[in-house]
Amino acid sequence: MAELQEVQITEEKPLLPGQTPEAAKIHSVETPYGSVTFTVYGTPKPKRPAILTYHDVGLNYKSCFQPLFQFGDMQEIIQNFVRVHVDAPGMEEGAPVFPLGYQYPSLDQLADMIPCVLQYLNFSTVIGVGVGAGAYILSRYALNHPDTVEGLVLINIDPNAKGWMDWAAHKLTGLTSSIPEMILGHLFSQEELSGNSELIQKYRNIITHAPNLDNIELYWNSYNNRRDLNFERGGDITLKCPVMLVVGDQAPHEDAVVECNSKLDPTQTSSLKMADSGGQPQLTQPGKLTEAFKYFLQGMGYMASSCMTRLSRSRTASLTSAASIDGNRSRSRTLSQSSESGTLSSGPPGHTMEVSC
């Protein structure tokens, strides 16, 4: 394996409006379940996986991930990886509305489209970053193709199929709420929606006035008809790669993420609960999530000497990452952090980290 590159940065900052954005290459490929559009940034790096993202319902890759990947400190990461942002069918900008009666793919079928994307690009492995429905899709893909997934960052994942009580509540809500309002309730907490901040107003406007709202409803229906992933700690059905679960404190999917954490391999899984981040931490707290993503990559043997930014200014943090590179690329990690409010330390993955700075 090539020697790990050390990159030093001194401060975090949003991407300035005057900075030149990366060139994007947009591709579409036919799959057994229809066409899928994806956008590629950067060039492949030797012996490094691609970062592949999948967005949630009501969003596309830009509205879901742009605040995170355009964040100043994230540039240290993305200059070391090629990125592939997948848009669910009909969610890409300018997508035509599907004809009446169109059979939208299930979430399992959306996962089955990903091999076509990787084959088209000639990419062998990925690190997946998914939110909500996208987190489910990437998890299903990882279960079906474990050898091609090096790691997963799963934000707001709900691995369970809807039960009868969920269905009853969903149907009842549908009688009194519009599709945009139901999707907003999926994306954000009730506290956020009641506060009606600029962020909420922005995303309410995006979803309510989306020209492809009929397509969004089809994706929403597929999400609500998802199958149970049937994760089982110690069983055959589990994620084989390192996993970082992320959820905001008091977010709509907090309980589902906690339950998911209890079902995954504790030696491979870290759980990050972010305070003051609401339902979409990649939108509201890109700095904190970037820092956590750096830790995650370091634990996998990438970017082992990346310096600290926001967290280092608010607390004392130490990171020890030891990687044993063999045929199975086994890796281990230790993270300890202390602050004025107390000490949080963890050994191997399988812990819950609460970030409140």
UniProtKB/Swiss-Prot annotation:
Cystine connections: none
Region listing for Disordered, in residue ranges: 1-20, 320-357
Main location: cytoplasm
Bias-annotated ranges (Low complexity): 333-347
Source superkingdom: Eukaryota
Residues with the Phosphoserine modification: S312, S314, S318, S321, S324, S330, S336, S338, S339, S341, S356
Pfam families: Ndr
GO CC terms: growth cone; perinuclear region of cytoplasm
Modified residues (Phosphothreonine): T20, T316, T320, T334, T343
Location of N-acetylalanine modifications: A2
Family named by the database record: Belongs to the NDRG family.
UniProt subunit comment: Interacts with CTNNB1.
Protein name (database record): Protein NDRG2
Organism annotation: Macaca fascicularis (Crab-eating macaque)
